Amino acid sequence: MADPKYANLPGIASNEPDVYETSDLPEDDQAQFESELEELCSDSVERIVVNPNAAYDKFKDKHVSAKSLDFSDRISKNRRVGYESGDYELLAEGCGVKETPQQKYQRLVNEIHELCQDVEKIQTSTKESGAEERLTPVALAQQAAQLKQQLVSAHLDSLLGPDAHINLTDPDGALAKRLLTQLEVARGVRSGAGADGKTAAPKGPDGVILYELHSRPEQEKFTESAKVAELERRLAELETAVGSGSDKRGPLSSGVQGSSLTETLELLQARVSALDAATLDQVEARLQSVLGKMNEIAKHKATMEDAETQSKVSQLYDVVQKWDAMATSLPQVVRRLTAVRELHEQAMQFGQLLTHLDTTQQMINNSLKDNSTLLTQVQQTMKENLLAVEENFSALDQRMKKLNK
């Protein structure tokens, strides 16, 4: 409570608890704030500036599927399914760690494998398209095969070690080469052991060398899809060469539309076989006769064209002769027309002036009529006023007479 001696002073609140305001935090909070401030100002703490908008744009439309995840504890031997990890590790952008050649190679191999699978799905799901500008599944398969061939030609086995397994284009050939090299090494070891009298290397049961063969079904699918792509490419080349469209058909391929490929080949073969030496002589003789007839037709056509041109020239000459008589009088006609044009312009101006005078005369007549009516009204009012004045004067005279009496 406040001191009683300040109870009756103005501006002092009474019957209220005392309040002492300060900008400092309570003592407990002050100690915690100082410790947090020291921790934030320490050099051991890495301060990262995070842009919320950039982070939102980075992870926009990204999601993690948790449909088949199970992180619960297990009592059986089967392992619970958590988040699945990939075959290789992708480094985040801006992490400051440089990607090693081994990681780059594994990433490229896995990406090309995924690309091949996507191309196979597209080839099985989509239909054939006639658009040449669009990237077709056949072109995608060819580009994927070229990328794999580039990876194989890089000879990364000797550079990256045995972990970099390259079995992309010919896994069977790679396994066969590896088996042959191991057999030769084993033969060399056997011959060395027999010559030196030393113990042979440890073998499998019954002294048989054991090999492990790993099948790659995805590689078989890829080779099959590559063969299909090559077949489709060759068929596309045949279609462009033989072509079923009217714009692609030549003189040899005319009349083969709608037939099968074998029938088309037989028809083309028959047409080509018809062009032998004996038939060519006959065709040449016929062409010579046709050429002579064409020359005669051209001569007759030239004479007919000359006759037509002569008739047209004569018609033009007659027209010019008719116009010679009129050409002498044409300047006079032109001068007369120019003079008549000036007269027409003056007459038009005079007509405009007459219409203006007519309108002004009508306005004056209307104003005179209005003035005459006003004058009659003024005259009538003046007469009425004179009569009233005369009556007033007569009344005034009578009153004066009465006053004089």
UniProtKB/Swiss-Prot annotation:
Keywords: Coiled coil, Cytoplasm, Cytoskeleton, Dynein, Membrane, Microtubule. Transmembrane segments: none annotated. GO terms for biological process: auditory receptor cell development; establishment or maintenance of apical/basal cell polarity; eye photoreceptor cell differentiation; glial cell differentiation; mitotic spindle organization; nuclear migration; P granule organization; photoreceptor cell maintenance. It comes from the Eukaryota. The keyword Coiled coil applies. Residues 102-125, 379-405 form a coiled coil. PANTHER family: DYNACTIN SUBUNIT. This is Dynactin subunit 2. The gene is dctn2.
